[in-house]
Amino acid sequence: MPRVVVPLSAPEAADPSRFGAKAANLAALVQAGLPVPAGFCVDARAYRIQLSALGLEESARGVFSSEDRPCARRCALETKLGLMQGAIVPEVREALLSAWRSIAGEGRPGVVRSSALVEDRAGSSFAGQFQSYLELESDEDFLTAVRACWAALWSTRALRYMATHGLDCADTAMAILIQRLVPAGAAGGGLSRTASGEMLVNAAPGLGAAVAQGEVVPDRYVLDRAGRVKESALAQKYHALSCAHGRRAFSRALFGAPCLDAEQLAELALLMHKCEEIVGGPAEIEWARDDTGISLLQARPLAVATAQVPDEIWLKHPGLNGHPSGIGWGEGRARVVNCECELERVGPGEVLVTTVAGPALSEILPHVSAVVAELGGSTSHLASLARERGVPMVLGVLDATRRIPDGSTVAVDGVSGVVRWMQ
């Protein structure tokens, strides 16, 4: 019987049908000699063993098979809580702890990351729809994180995403990544190819979660194909997500300091070129830098759009610049929303103007013509979802909720990163 937990360096780890595309892509990077944190991947079979042992298979099948919505919600909740609270099957638990103790624990923090079989594929990235757990140190916390990753397949957010893509949770499974935590001094993402043929890097101090969740405006670097800096926009840095279980404040002297130098950017460009070879085309990456250098945390296929020429009428109106998602042109009535509780105010075809563009907004993407956000960058999870759906988005647009009048007509260029409006 195949092993349920295998190191990323094992040839079998590159099988997406067992370990999901996220883990399989990382395994391919490891086997190509690229810098990836040490770790293991957990076969999706472990999830299926657990589901069966807990008697949850019938509840799982009832989520999308039932036309009774209250019944479907009850089935989803039963499955989620069962996976979260149930004891892990002994043979699976033993294999998990053996892998975990070899790379983390006893003061060595580790991470547990989702790698669903439907994740990180072309057309369904699931960016930000599942969970990752950082800075885990004890066996108990590790096992809790594993159960939480399995249960995340049945979260409301994931179920909605699957429904819009015609997927059924009962037909898929959750594999898992176990890795050493990179105590990052800086982290972010990168796009190996933009609409204009350049490369793009986002960076922020500390761990990369703040960039992925769209909670900060990151540094933005545009590189040529040789990795030389063509353009840079440095963000103001007030705090960083650190490995000390919180945020650390910055001294005023570091507010505008770059996160990366030219040599580090050239190294990232080279790594993105190699990732393109492995994923078979343009790639989107996540990375982190500590005292030992740059590590790759993720690589997935990237859809690249062509630039559009704006109508000259828009050039006469006021505009703001930001970080483009890299796809699309959209127009519509602006709907300024300051918190998620106001999303019901956003009508079909309107342009959502908001502060934080987090993955929770993914459910509204099918209904809007474009999104403008004050925080976030081109490599955030929501930007990935916007590219996937062809929704124009510009992030890091400072003062957007104050400058763009609610109800005004707005044009959003998701390729150039320009937002214009007229009364």
Language model: regions and residue ranges:
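N-terminal beta-alpha lobe that positions the nucleotide/phosphoryl donor
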Residues: 1-177, 186, 263, 276, ...
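Structured core elements
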Residues: 7, 28, 111-113, 125, ...
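Short, glycine-/Ser/Thr-/acidic-enriched flexible segments
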Residues: 13, 43, 117-119, 131, ...
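Terminal amphipathic helices with adjacent charged low-complexity linkers/tails
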Residues: 42-59, 241, 277-316, 418
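Acidic, glycine-rich flexible loop/linker segments
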Residues: 57, 211, 301-306, 328-346, ...
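Beta-strand scaffold of nucleotide-dependent catalytic cores
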Residues: 113, 124, 134-135, 145-146, ...
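Conserved catalytic alpha/beta cores of large enzymes that bind or transform nucleotide phosphates
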Residues: 202-284, 289-290
